Amino acid sequence: QVVAKGMAERIGISGSRVSMSVDENEKLVKDVELHNHIEAIKEVLNMLLAGPIKSVEEIDAVGHRMGHGGEYFDKSVVIDEDVLAKAREAGDLLPLHGAAFLYGIDAITELLPKVKQVATFDSSFHQSMKKEAFLYAIPLDQYEKHKIRRYGFHGTSHKYVAEEAAKMLGYKGKFISCHLGGGASVTAIENGRSVDTSMGFTPMAGMIMGTRCGDIDPYIPLHIMKTQNMTADEVNAMLNKESGWYGLTRGYTDLRDIE
């Protein structure tokens, strides 16, 4: 039974707010500056305590949507030190969100130290892809020794959409799922399993996104480094944080603002 649902949005940019729906007739909205994800989690907890629950003792577990599980995880897991170590290792491949996921775990550990925490990885759903879908056409050693491959992301979203669509249509065959937001991806799903997806080794690949470039000629970063005297870290920051809609519009990441 769903007691409440909601979101914290536009974190780190103007117009941030926290909203929560207790039922269809009641929606609470709080406009508040959310400078980072830790502040957002605190506001969510405050809103829950002011509404559907009266004490933190009512919270049995907290689920975390994690970004990258590498090849370690193909399902949700209870968080322990081993899981955290592997998540930190895989999280290094997520320049935009890697640390943010861990901030959430740290915040809950501090605020609710006795509550069980569970990690659900965005990449887990795509572990069903076959080699012809996840291998890149580069020397095979790059995968076998360094695990460079297509991982895919937004798996929790694509999995949920596929399951709900199958229920609604009474059909579990082939679907194309589109996740469209600040980050965006498309996934081909067959019989409830991911068979191909637009994101790749990192969430930078695929479609144009809020601040990410999406697919570009792979020589472009090398050309920029050679001709503009930029380091690899500087080019990475540009492609992850200064490109996409932000780069094309010189400053806007939200399509609602661009429209």
Segments and roles (model prediction):
Residues 1-34, 200:
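Short glycine-rich, Thr/Ser-proximal phosphate-binding strand/loop in the N-terminal lobe
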Residues 35-39, 78, 82, 99-103, ...:
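Conserved active-site and cofactor/substrate-binding residues in soluble primary-metabolism enzymes
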Residues 48-97, 118, 125-133:
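Short beta-strand-loop/turn "lid" adjacent to the catalytic site in phosphate-handling enzymes
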Residues 125-227:
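Glycine-rich phosphate-binding loop of actin/hexokinase-like ATP-binding domains
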Residues 227-259:
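A mobile "lid/hinge" subdomain adjacent to the ATP/sugar-phosphate binding pocket shared
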